[in-house]
């Protein structure tokens, strides 16, 4: 059962993730972040690359992206490092958009999406080799 703030977040962000990005926001994202993933967050490309190195992401490793929204930086990290990623968030719309992005990036076989709150993740201990939690409103 979702608590009130999770319901509010789901409603707010489902609407936001359902809107297509404008040309202006995509250009701004390319200039500021260095990538175009749908104006989803503020983690730069350089920061994402640093995370990949620090987490030692590579083929065969499993990454959990908590509060992934439209999939940035989790999908980027999976593509760049060849790891497997599980995206989690409360709003389904963001995860649907992320799954579409995974198809565009050619990584659907190494990515999945689960509607889940960070308060109650449905995974056992030691399921993942690394976890990222970026640009999440807590």
Label every model-predicted segment:
Residues 32-41:
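Class I SAM-dependent methyltransferase Rossmann-like catalytic core
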Residues 130-138:
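A short SAM/SAH-binding and catalytic strip from SAM-dependent methyltransferases
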Residues 1-32:
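N-terminal, positively charged/glycine-rich alpha-helical extensions of SAM-dependent methyltransferases
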Residues 119-130:
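A short acidic, Gly/Pro-enriched loop at the edge of an enzyme's catalytic core
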Residues 41-59:
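Conserved alpha-helix/loop element of class I SAM-dependent methyltransferases that forms part
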């Amino acid at each position: 059962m979702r608590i009130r703030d999770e319901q509010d977040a789901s409603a707010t962000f489902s609407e936001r993730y359902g809107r297509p990005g404008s040309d202006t926001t995509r250009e701004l994202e390319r200039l500021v972040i260095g990538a175009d993933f749908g104006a989803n967050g503020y983690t730069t490309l350089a920061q994402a690359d640093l995370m990949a190195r620090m987490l030692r992401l590579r083929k065969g490793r499993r990454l959990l992206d908590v509060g992934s929204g439209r999939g940035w930086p989790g999908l980027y990290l999976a593509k760049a490092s060849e790891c497997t990623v599980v995206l989690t968030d409360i709003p389904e719309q963001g995860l649907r958009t992320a799954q579409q992005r995974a198809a565009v990036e050619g990584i659907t076989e190494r990515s999945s999406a689960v509607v889940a709150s960070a308060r109650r993740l449905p995974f056992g201990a030691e399921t993942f080799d690394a976890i990222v939690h970026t640009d999440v409103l807590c």
